Amino acid sequence: MSKKALLIIPPERFNEDELFQPKEVLENTGVAVTVASTKTGEITGDYLGKALAEVIFSEVSASDYDAVAVIGGSGTNDHLWGNQELQSFLKQAHEQKVLVSGICAGSVTVAKTGLLSGRKAACYPVDVQIDELKANSVEYAKQHVVAHDDIITGDGPDGAKEFGESLAAALR
């Protein structure tokens, strides 16, 4: 049975590299990828790239997936950081032994759940994100990917392919 990953993007302004590079890596290793958001339909990225959100994350069961990833982009700060429904979804996924991950601003979204408290994480190297990690008792690590057994975080576009490879390796 093939592995399944749910990639969650904001309803606008996702980062194209952070979605498309990991998605391609996962699909090339046989992982079935579903793109989710807070709405379905076509979503425009930070650089006008287009993605199709097939499902609303809150309408699917985390346990149907082997991995859940929160993708970054300027819309992630605005729409996903404070989304209580998403935080509950990620905590539930973690409880059900689903691999939880985030890249760039998505790492901060994961940190806000408390799941990374006392641990290291990667995020985009800007103060607003690093400060949010610290505010959630997470130690910032200046590297492309930080992989724990249960949670993986990535820094952003430069580490997007490596983030995808880390997810794929964890799902093998």
Task: Pin down the residues of each PLM region.
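Extended, subdomain-level signal for the structured scaffold at the beginning of enzyme domains
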Residues: 1-100, 109-117, 130-172
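Glycine/proline-rich loop-helix segments at beta-alpha junctions forming the active-site rim
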Residues: 124-126
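Catalytic nucleophile serine of serine hydrolases
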Residues: 104
